[in-house]
Swiss-Prot record:
Taxon lineage: Bacteria, Bacillati, Cyanobacteriota, Cyanophyceae, Oscillatoriophycideae
Record-linked InterPro entries: DUF445, UCP032178
Annotated Gene Ontology cellular component terms: plasma membrane
Native species: Gloeothece citriformis (strain PCC 7424)
Official protein name in the record: UPF0754 membrane protein PCC7424_0748
Keyword set, alphabetical order: Cell inner membrane, Cell membrane, Membrane, Transmembrane, Transmembrane helix
Main location class: membrane
UniProt family annotation: Belongs to the UPF0754 family.
Amino acid sequence: MLIALELSTIWTIALPPITGAIIGYFTNDIAIKMLFRPYKARYIFKRRLPFTPGLIPRNQERLAKRVSDTIMGSLLTPEEIQNLARRLLKTERVQSAILWLLQLAIKQIRADKEQKTAKILAGILSDLFGQSLPRLLKVLARRDDFLEAQINQIFDRILLEFRLTDLQARQLADWLLDTVISPDILRQLLIDFLTDRNIQVIDEGFREKTSGTYWVVANIFGLRNTLTRLRTFCLDEKETANTRLKELLLSLEMRTRLREWLQNLSLQNLPISTVRQLRKTTRDTVRSYIQQSGAQFLQDFNQSIDWEKLAIVVVNRLQASTVVTDSLEMISQELALILERYLEEDLERIVSQAIPILSIDQIIIEKIVATSPKELEAATEGIVKNELQAIVNLGGILGFFVGTIQTVILLLR
């Protein structure tokens, strides 16, 4: 009897705290299950039972809308998205991304077996020289100062200072004496020049314009017979005439004189006014040619070149060039700085335009609606167990405390 009384007293004292602790500890799990279950509506005689499905499955779309509004209104505000974009688009990260893309492009070009890059480059070059440059040239050639500075610079630095070297002067003099004014050509020129009319004009002029001893010679002997005999000699005695002319050129040292004259030939020896006029004439001539025939020249030039072969050579050259590889980092850095300056000015506008395009709120709603109630329940339980375990433990402690108070009240009665 005493033992039974003691057990009853022990249960009276211990049961409320234990029961309260158990209820408090498992209340969260029970509440979560009550929120989500049943997952689907239950029907009896085609009538849906109350409280089916669970609270969250029944209002999943409205819950998704509220979650989306909360996230977009408090967490993913435009200002926060701008800050996120700034962190993501730091110069170092952007530079690394651009450098990676450039290196990837170089590798892709090297692995290109069909020469697609070369074909694209060939098309660009062909369009540039065949269409774009001729049209641009037609527009620029109308300006009065078109190529003025460039032509003047070429004239001053190249043409004005140009002089033949000793070797060049010797070769040019040899070519002139052997080809242009050879003895045979000189003989033929004499024959062509000494026509009857020219002989008569020379003879009459010599008679009229001489005086003194020369007048006596001109009027007694005259030049007609002499020039006529010279022409006859050149016609009848070709070899002898050529030999005499050659001896005359040698005796006059024409080769040496011509070489020295060519070597000393320079535009700098001309008067300043003549040089200026020559520069203007050169500029006008070049400009006139470009205006009239420049576009056609570029088009003909474009048709005469196999751009695809040239592009293949250029691409292969660039692939093997260390300059291209070494300059990738510098190029990526410059592009990153340009992008940074652009974002500093227009980041707010870009974000405001990007938010409607991204439709983040709609994505959140669609993801929540597409998630099954079972998966939502598992995710909620996982968060509670892993991140909110202290609340579960606190529920058990509070339940134990309430049960202890009940025990004290019972004992006081």
